[in-house]
From Swiss-Prot:
This is Putative ABC transporter ATP-binding protein BCE_2668. NCBIfam families: PRK13648.1 (NF010167). Its main location: membrane. It is found in: Cell membrane. Probably part of an ABC transporter complex. Responsible for energy coupling to the transport system. Belongs to the ABC transporter superfamily. Its EC number is 7.-.-.-. The lineage of its organism: Bacteria, Bacillati, Bacillota, Bacilli, Bacillales. It comes from Bacillus cereus (strain ATCC 10987 / NRS 248). It is an enzyme of class 7 (translocase).
Length: 566
């Protein structure tokens, strides 16, 4: 069988770049395969995707050498229009994908360009939406849809093209666990029905394993460093060495010094249950649990907070909780649970009446949004909704200029924060040249320059690879140690388990859990009620059959925190 995608000793260097972005790349993908191309930010994986779909060389100029064939043809010799018939692409930023004012209009875009007659067009659009179970949303505006629904509509649009290859650029970047699982199942279903070749660009290895991949291609610093089945890749130690995260249960097994004997470490169900339970019980017997924590001063107190949008039922219903100085709290819950509404109420966007929001004991209900912003900062999930300036340095300096800081102070604060957030080398770059993850770090860096008391972060690590995830969260912990408080609105269970001192879970506007993250996320009933996903580590512990899996989770993350000096 001939490969449908073939790279042979391929090199590409962007115009004005000092060196090639991808170097001596060789790999083959065969018809009907499901392949993950993984690497951290800047590794060259997106460049490979652009070579496949024709954005290189037709939108991004540069010099290439070597061989690239898509379905037997060199895409460099055709046109981007011709290439779009072979390779359909779903972008990381769902909002950037939409053109139509309604779902059906957006799905019909390709057909309109092909001058398909109206009757046939309506039929094809209807069939495509039915394939992805979105036919009941055909009249809705894309902006009324959730992230997962937007992703699904984009896929429906691709199905109208009959492209043989479906290319997904970080499809899970902005999705909650339920939507992520839905997207993966949808891709599997499309592959099963139509035998499309699936190529996914991602750094989230664990989530993509649910796709039953045929192989994983790892790229680092522009070079292919490994190609193999998921079993082969996970049995090696290569992922951490190139800044990618292993599944949490594998990290746990290594931390417990588990010997997998015959290298069977994936899938989890293939492990020897007795060996796993033995090493877990042995490890637990050696642990001591430190419950004594230093007394912290209360920063935020929320009492009886309720909120309803006009002509709608309550979105928040009698919410009560406290937040201490230097504390990191994860705010969890399914889409529509009230997480964003709560954040908007804290910063003053939503006006509430019969409640109390106290900062350092002072009721701030009468404060303006601007005054609240001096003590509570909010960072949106989508960085494109926050960035207003043309360059990195202008963006990070913007709020400091509004606060009338001197030029010298602005320069010192801006450069210091850029270095901490690993953005200093890009300080003079135009915003449009940044990746999504870099833009995310920039919005957070901009907030940090003004020294608020509490920062609310909406999906702080979305769009960031594991290297920058670890680096950024280490930085957040250092800030917390100095007394700065954080609330994370997140769907990332690993983030909550590893870095949150506490987890608050919302369901239909009510607080249904408020405890340490290990206790909350080790409680099956809470996970089920809130539509949250079990971590693979918790699945491993349940698989082992030990008597008290919740106890293990507490001990495990307590041990990590003590080791890191938290």
């Amino acid at each position: 069988m001939q490969p449908i995608i073939s790279f042979e000793q391929f090199n590409f260097q962007y115009k004005h770049a000092a060196q090639p972005t991808v170097k001596d790349v060789t790999f083959h993908i065969y018809p009907g395969e499901k392949v993950l191309i993984a690497g951290r930010s800047g590794s060259g994986k997106s460049t490979l995707a652009h070579c496949m779909n024709g954005l290189i060389p037709f939108s991004y100029e540069g010099t290439s050498t070597g061989t690239i064939l898509i379905d037997g043809k060199d895409p460099r010799k055709g046109s981007i229009f011709e290439q779009s018939k072979q390779v359909g692409t779903i972008l990381q930023d769902q909002d950037a994908q939409f053109i139509g004012l309604t779902v059906e209009e957006d799905v019909a875009f390709y057909l309109e360009n092909e001058c398909v007659n109206e009757d046939d067009m309506k039929k094809i659009v209807s069939e495509s939406l039915k394939k992805v179970k979105m036919h009941n949303f055909h009249k809705q505006s894309p902006h009324e849809l959730s992230g997962g629904q937007k992703q699904t509509v984009s896929l429906a649009g691709l199905l109208t093209t009959n492209a043989h290859i479906l290319l997904f650029d970080e499809p899970l970047a902005n999705l909650d666990p339920v939507s992520s699982l839905h997207t993966v199942e949808l891709i599997k279903d499309i592959h099963k029905q139509y035998n499309k070749t699936i190529v996914i660009i991602e750094h989230r290895i664990e989530e993509m394993l649910n796709l039953d991949l045929d192989k994983i291609i790892l790229i680092d610093e522009g070079e292919i460093v490994a190609i193999g089945t998921p079993e082969k890749i996970l049995a090696s130690n290569i992922l951490p060495s190139i800044g990618l995260r292993e599944p949490m249960y594998i990290e746990g097994l290594k931390r417990l010094h588990f010997d997998s004997n015959n290298d069977v470490i994936y899938p989890l169900e293939n492990l020897q249950r007795e060996s796993v339970s033995g090493v877990i019980n042995e490890w637990m017997e050696k642990q001591t649990f430190c419950k004594d924590t230093p007394t912290k001063k209360e920063l935020l107190k929320v009492e009886n907070l309720s909120f309803s949008y006009p002509n709608k039922q309550k979105v928040l219903d009698n919410v009560n909780f406290s937040l201490f100085k230097g504390e990191i709290v994860a705010l969890l819950g399914h889409n529509g649970a009230g997480k964003s509404t709560l954040a908007h109420s804290l910063i003053g966007i939503n006006k509430t009446k019969n409640d109390r929001i106290l900062i350092d004991g002072v009721n701030i209900n009468s404060w303006s949004i601007r005054k609240r912003g001096e003590v509570i900062s909010y960072v949106m999930q989508n960085p494109n909704h926050m960035i207003t300036q043309a360059t990195v340095m202008e963006e990070i300096s913007f709020s400091l200029k509004l606060k009338k800081f001197s030029k010298e102070e602005i320069k010192v604060r801006a450069e210091e924060t850029l270095k901490i957030c690993d953005l200093y080398p890009f300080r003079n770059w135009p915003i449009q040249a940044l990746s999504y993850g870099q833009k995310k770090r920039l919005t957070i860096a901009s907030v940090l320059t003004t020294n608020p008391k509490l920062i609310i972060l909406d999906e702080p690590t979305a769009g960031q690879d594991y290297y920058h995830y670890k680096q950024f969260m280490t930085f957040i912990r250092k800030l917390a140690a100095k007394g700065l408080s954080f609330i994370f609105i997140t769907h990332d269970m690993n983030l909550a388990l590893e870095y949150a001192d506490r987890a608050i879970v919302l369901k239909e506007g009510e607080v249904i859990a408020n405890n340490t993250a290990s206790i909350v996320l080790g409680h099956p009933e809470t996970l089920k009620r809130a539509n949250l996903k079990e971590s693979s580590l918790f699945k491993l512990v349940k698989f082992s059959g030990i008597a008290n899996p919740e106890r293990f989770m507490e001990l495990y993350f307590d041990d990590i925190r003590r080791e890191e000096g938290v």
